[in-house]
Amino acid sequence: MVDVLYLHRFDPETALDETLETFAMLREQGKIRYLGLSNFAAWQVMKAAAIAMQFDLGISILQPMYSLIKRQAEVEILPMCASEGIAVAGYSPLGSGLLSGKYRRGESGRLSQDERYAARYDDKQMHVAADALGALAEELNTHPATLAVVWASRHPAAPIPIISARSTDQLMPSLNAMHYIMDDALYERLAALMPGPPPATDRSEET
């Protein structure tokens, strides 16, 4: 049995009721436990949730991209999940390795080997933030990857960072995040390294 089966991307060409009916059938057959979504906008999640109710299904977990330098999920995705009781498993907490400091050390990775990833992080502010994170990690005598993973888990929606690595040496700093205590002051200091996304509405100053 599969614990969580994800719809990896919203498909405008396929009716959601057909897809979710299939998920319901798979659950009835004992093949899956929970339904998850990945790379869905907030409105797409709520549309899926409304249709899923027809089949006695719920959206259990959402998998958005989320890191110190990719924070769009803070606008609607993370608040929605907190409101609706949907778990969050954020992927790419290291920004495809940019926040690990490995590119500063001259190591290779997705950003240097894949044009799609290079384009995704082709933003000077992201690279400035990554450099500042590295300097702060040195100041605190820790690894930048540790700080990045802890930061990505500290949002009030309690995201669970999805970590990955090509070697044990790369993996350990991320695992060390489990034991690193980050207070509010450090969390805010890290958050200030990269401008947050604009709010979902244009009159938020009136609230």
Regions found by a protein language model. Name each.
Residues F10-P197:
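Beta/alpha (TIM)-barrel catalytic core signal, keyed to glycine-rich beta->alpha loops juxtaposed to Asp/Glu
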Residues V4-L5:
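Acidic/hydrophobic-patterned starts of short beta strands in beta-sheet-rich repeat architectures
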Residues T201-E206:
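Short coil/turn segments at secondary-structure boundaries
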